[in-house]
Amino acid sequence: MEAVETSTGTSSANADLYILGAGVSFPEHLSIETIEILGHCGMICTNLQEKHLSLFPPDLRLKCKSLWGLYLDGRPRSENYLDVVEEVLRITETTRPTAWLTPGHPLIFDSVSAALLSRGRAKGWSVCVLPAISCLDTILGDVEYDPARGLFVYEATGLVRRNVGIPPNTPVLLLQPSVFNIDHALLSVNTEGPNLSPLRDYLLNFYDRSHRCAFVRSASRLSGPAQIVWREIGDISSLPYRDIAGSTLFIPNA
C-alpha cells in the first residue's frame, strides 16, 4: 500500500497506533484503506460489541478485542472512557501497530479517540487518524439537505451550558440529545432517558413552540432502518427514550 502523508507528517503505512472509524453502518461503511490498515495491524481494539465482530472476515476477527465490557451502565461516562483509553494504550505498548476502531468518524464527538491521539503522541508514538462516514454525512442524506445553504452544528448539552445563540434563519444539527445533561452511561433503550425540558425551553428563545424539528437516527445494519421522528419544539420533552436514543436533532430554518 502506498504511504500517504497526513497533515501531521505521519505516514498511514507506518504508524504505531491507528485511530479508525467504522462508519455509521458496520461493516459496509469501512473504507478500502481502513480495511487494508486493519489487515496490517497486530491487534484491533474496538468498542463494537462481541456479537457484531462476526461480520468481519476470519483473519480480521481473530485480531479483534472488544472493549465493550468496560462501558458500564450508570457509571460516569468519563470513567468508562478512561478505562478504555488505558486498555488501548496498554495493548499498544506491546503490540504495534494497534488499531482503535470506533463507530462513526473517529474524531467527531469521540472522547476516547481524542484522548488516544493526545496521549499516544505524548508517548512519542506515531499516531494516524483516518476519516470515516459520520452521522453528519448520513443525516444530511436522511433529511435531504444541502449544507451549501448553511448549517449550524453543536452538541446539545454544550449549546445550553455555554448559552450559545442560534441563528434561526440557518438549519441546525444538535448532536447527542439522547444524553442531554446526563454525565453517566445509558446503555439500554428501556431507560427513562434525559429530561429535555431545559433544551426545549432554551430553543424557545429562538423558535416558536409550533416550529417543527426531527430526531433523526440513520439506518445501519446493527440498529435497523432510518428513523425520523418529527415534533413541534414545544413537545420534544414528551418523547419516549426509544424515539431519541442514538439520534441527532435536526431543526430546519424558521
Named regions from a protein language model:
Residues 2-20, 43, 93, 126-254:
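Beta-strand/loop-alpha-helix module characteristic of Rossmann-like adenine-cofactor folds
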